[in-house]
């Protein structure tokens, strides 16, 4: 397999009115666990159900109802940890995070502060060919999601939908290793890609199944290196947390604004206040939500209703044996086995379905040609029509059949595109459609020679020009292909034209 090595990108430098500044970003990603049932109850997790229809007595904190851990959610967290090359903790525990909010019926959230199920891991975030940032994962813990408060249905009333209450979340906490807005968005995209490959979260940001809390601070050049040497976070400046970001574009915009806001405060001699902020995409700015709480503000303590969670190494090993090939490994293999470029490999492995489609087309064929057709023809058409790979009218077998006809010399590249169009709109077997439509390339050298002789005889002036400038021989090739209705084999035409003109 191809061994890919990378250089570390330089941090983003922002020029203030008085000084240069660098960005420091850490992220907490809340990923909804792909599970049919909630973390501590059997209630459904179906999105878009009638309000308060997916709620059990446990979810709405009825007296006497006790939580029971969903083993599948635990397995999904372990699977995620393995996918992020993280330490799996065989003993973890649940804690109560105490705060009042209308959509939190228990009056506390069950989380894992002191003993998370997953420890330190890492994510490699590519920022261009040969350039990547290694982002360290501090921890992954399981916790409950809250419900949804609705304030815009009535001018005098607020409503609460508890369907989301108790749904399992994985909170994936990074170290402050991200150094720019583009890196932050790329980190979320890479994490989402890995989770989708693993099948542990669908990554649907629009539905709120993947949300990001972004911690932003600014420091002077050299301060980050001092932090690395001492692990003293004071070198990184005072951070502000931007909550519940559900768009890559908004994440970048919010970081850009927040960095400028903090720089302006510091250069005016002020101090940045540690707080939680929200991003308003309509105004393109962050605004204060509340002062930033510390762990002690939530009065964490071990949940007395739940025993420590103990798992066996043999079970972890069993999950490890079922792990799929992940994006980085698949990319390296595609480049090594099929000869595709770094860029093409990234495109082809972006989604698991797309990678599987490409591999089905490329197996036993020219990998570069397969990549070209899948990316330019198939993906181009899908994007134009707003379709997913699963909705593609042309199957991998059909596209592979088109490439086989090109390889055998039966059809030209132009014919292949016409054939692809017919398959897209009408379907059918490529070979049968090509035969029925008379889409067969002329490879008979005698017929091609006759056509070349006729074109040369009719254009003596062009012959002299081509002999003086061999590049003009292409004109004859074009005329012959045109005369044969596009059916003449271009390679054969080129060879015969060159021979006839004495080039």
From Swiss-Prot:
Query: What domain of life does the UniProt record list for this protein's source?
Result: Bacteria
- A Pfam family annotated for this UniProt entry: GatB_Yqey
Q: What is its EC number?
A: 6.3.5.-
Q: Does the keyword Cell wall biogenesis/degradation apply?
A: no
Keywords, A to Z? ATP-binding, Ligase, Nucleotide-binding, Protein biosynthesis
Protein function: Allows the formation of correctly charged Asn-tRNA(Asn) or Gln-tRNA(Gln) through the transamidation of misacylated Asp-tRNA(Asn) or Glu-tRNA(Gln) in organisms which lack either or both of asparaginyl-tRNA or glutaminyl-tRNA synthetases. The reaction takes place in the presence of glutamine and ATP through an activated phospho-Asp-tRNA(Asn) or phospho-Glu-tRNA(Gln).
The record's NCBIfam families line, in alphabetical order, gives: gatB, PRK05477.1-2, PRK05477.1-4, PRK05477.1-5
Tell me the protein family, please: Belongs to the GatB/GatE family. GatB subfamily.
Q: How does it assemble?
A: Heterotrimer of A, B and C subunits.
Q: What is this protein called?
A: Aspartyl/glutamyl-tRNA(Asn/Gln) amidotransferase subunit B
Q: Which species does the entry assign this protein to?
A: Cereibacter sphaeroides (strain ATCC 17025 / ATH 2.4.3) (Rhodobacter sphaeroides)
The lineage, from the top, is: Bacteria, Pseudomonadati, Pseudomonadota, Alphaproteobacteria, Rhodobacterales
């Amino acid at each position: 397999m191809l061994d890919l090595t990378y250089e570390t990108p330089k941090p983003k430098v922002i020029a203030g009115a008085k000084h240069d500044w660098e960005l420091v970003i850490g992220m907490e990603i809340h990923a909804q666990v792909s599970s049919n049932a909630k973390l501590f109850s059997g209630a459904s997790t179906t999105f878009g159900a009638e309000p308060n229809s997916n709620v059990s007595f446990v979810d709405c904190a009825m007296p006497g109802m006790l939580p029971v851990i969903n083993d599948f959610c635990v397995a999904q967290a372990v699977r995620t940890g393995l996918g992020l090359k993280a330490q799996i903790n065989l003993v973890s525990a649940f804690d109560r995070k105490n705060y009042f909010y209308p959509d939190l019926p228990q009056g506390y959230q069950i989380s894992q502060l002191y003993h998370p199920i997953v420890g330190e891991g890492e994510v490699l975030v590519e920022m261009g060919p040969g350039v990547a940032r290694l982002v360290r994962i501090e921890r992954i813990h399981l916790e409950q999601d809250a419900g949804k408060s609705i304030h815009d249905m009535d001018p005098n009333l607020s409503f609460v939908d508890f369907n989301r209450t108790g749904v399992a979340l994985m909170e994936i906490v990074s170290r402050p290793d991200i150094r720019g807005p583009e890196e932050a968005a790329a980190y979320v995209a890479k994490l989402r890609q890995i989770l989708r490959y693993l099948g542990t979260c669908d990554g649907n940001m629009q539905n709120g199944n993947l949300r990001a809390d972004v911690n932003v601070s600014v420091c002077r050049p050299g301060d980050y290196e001092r932090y690395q040497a001492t692990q003293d976070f004071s070198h990184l400046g005072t951070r502000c947390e931007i909550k519940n970001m559900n768009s890559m574009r908004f994440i970048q915009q919010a970081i850009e604004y927040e960095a400028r806001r903090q720089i302006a405060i510091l250069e005016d001699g002020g101090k940045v206040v540690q707080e939680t902020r929200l991003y308003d995409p309509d105004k393109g700015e962050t605004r204060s939500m509340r002062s930033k709480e510390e762990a002690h503000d939530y009065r964490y303590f071990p949940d007395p209703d739940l025993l420590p969670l103990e798992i066996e190494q043999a079970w972890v090993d069993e999950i490890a044996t079922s792990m799929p090939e992940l994006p980085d490994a698949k990319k390296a293999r595609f480049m090594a086995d099929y000869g595709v470029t770094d860029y093409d490999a990234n495109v082809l492995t972006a989604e698991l379905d797309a990678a599987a489609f490409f591999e089905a087309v490329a197996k036993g064929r020219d990998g570069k040609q397969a990549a070209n057709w899948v990316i330019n023809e198939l993906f181009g058409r899908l994007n134009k029509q707003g379709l997913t790979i699963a909705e593609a009218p042309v199957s991998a077998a059909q596209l592979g059949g088109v490439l086989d006809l090109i390889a055998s010399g039966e059809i030209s590249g132009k014919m292949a595109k016409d054939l692809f169009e017919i398959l897209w709109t009408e379907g059918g077997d490529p070979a049968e459609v090509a035969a029925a439509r008379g889409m067969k390339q002329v490879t008979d050298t005698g017929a091609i020679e006759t056509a070349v002789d006729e074109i040369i005889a009719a254009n003596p002036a062009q012959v002299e020009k081509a002999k003086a400038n061999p590049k003009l021989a292409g004109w004859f090739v074009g005329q012959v292909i045109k005369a044969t209705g596009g059916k003449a084999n271009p390679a054969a035409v080129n060879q015969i034209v060159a021979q006839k003109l004495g080039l």
